[in-house]
Amino acid sequence: MIGLLRKSRVEKDLTEGNFMKTQLNYKFWFCTGSQDLYGDECLSHVAAHSKEIVECLNKSGKLPFEVVWKPTMITNEVIRRTFNEANNDPTCAGVITWMHTFSPAKSWILGHQELRKPLAHLHTQYNREIPYETMDMDFMNENQAAHGDREYAHILSRMGIERKTIVGYWQDAEVQEKLASWMRTAIGIVESSHIRVMRVADNMRNVAVTEGDKVEAQLKFGWEVDAYPVNEIAEAVDAVSQSDVNVLVDEYYSKYDICLEGRDPEEFKKHVAVQAQIELGFERFLEEKNYQAIVTHFGDLGALKQLPGLAIQRLMEKGYGFGAEGDWKVAAMVRLMKIMTTGMKDAKGTSMLEDYTYNLVKGKEGIIQAHMLEICPTISDGPIQIKCQPLSMGDREDPARLVFQSKTGKGIATSLIDLGNRFRLIIQDVDCKKVEKPLPKLPTAINFWTPQPDFYTGTETWLLAGGAHHTAFTYDLTAEQMGDWAAAMGIEAVYIDKDTKIRDFKRDLALGSLFYGK
């Protein structure tokens, strides 16, 4: 499946400069099921109704991508041909199916054996209300999604086909919103196989949770994870011209608040210029080698003058994934989430985060989320400062970094872990809050959250599941979307949310071990 999905990417939208600024140019095919038993008049109504539904969905303003009507699926040959055309169309990101009439499900077997695009089963019907006074057998034959969709869903279940099922009336906002939400998951499924992670350094020595099977990750997710000597990318940094550095530094100084904290302005600016040079050198190297995510490690900086900080933050803001201390799984997940939220209106941001320290005051419990330097400014709330302070990690010059407070609101924290013979995705709902008091001596960007259902249950279940201290965090996706992505990838997903109970969670972990293989 991964191999065929690789054809689906619309290359031009993600390889031009500043590659997350353009809306992905994908479409979703609407395939209505019927059969020729009912005659031409009925089939003409089926086609007309399907076109009307597609037009309504596209005009709703709720869908992030266009829906494309396809001729009615009435035979095995038509279904098989259409699905293979979907496989080979690089603009098709998924298929939406609906049975207007009864559609014998054996006709769908060969097509679904060959379909390699994400699938949503929209269980709806053309008419909202039963026409009590006029309904006759002709109407019954023509409008029997309640019948046809059950037949269709049966064969999908028998074949073990992963799909999203959406139930409701096609004009209702909640149905359109569910379809829109699934579209973003489908983009994640399709685009996953285009994620390439550049490792500028190996895993932090003796750390367990950031390790993982890169071959299995490519088999499961399509991710390519490659290592480059740090001094090779350092050469790309050194090759950046001073004039280019000056232009970018000027941009920094116009965009961010400069916080000298007693440092000499010229000396401060030189430290900032090092990060500008790193940003330009890293980005050019990533573009040249066609990578969309990067990992670094403070223990392996080679000829780099500073630990990349502001530079990495800016790259994440542009859409690149990042993981610290060699954490390629987080880098890939951050990239994935940024793809899934591309073009989202009022997006609040996505970033790598790390659990740092707790507040254990009763009624005020929470976790400070930060890192030494590298938090994405898309999650910032209010002014962003550039600060330059000493950092013992890395034994290099004082690195410049962006410092800010994060937005409040609901988000999800995810941790993809390698359990030895399989992957598990842990998904936790969190409530992001403002810190109670300022942190004047902490020169990092921060987030502060309380995990659901409460600090104690949320933390205990995270530990039971084996969750990492690094997370891929976003305000803009839901646990359902990420769980659907995990299901499409064939891996376990565990949820920690407002309804989580310790006893039930332990049972879910035990059942997951049995199902996915302990």
Question: What is each of the regions a protein language model found here?
Answer:
Residues 250-251, 255-343:
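Long, internal scaffold/assembly segments composed of regular secondary structure
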Residues 71-85, 175-177:
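Structural motif
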Residues 44-59:
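Short catalytic helix/loop segments, enriched in acidic residues and glycine
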Residues 79-92, 109-111, 279-288:
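Short, well-structured alpha-helical segments in soluble
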Residues 64-66, 123, 127-263:
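Cap/lid and interdomain-hinge subdomains that line or gate substrate/regulatory clefts
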Residues 319-443:
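C-terminal catalytic subdomain
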Residues 394-518:
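Extended hydrophobic packing segments that form well-structured cores
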Residues 21-45, 194-203:
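Short beta-strand segments enriched in small/hydrophobic residues
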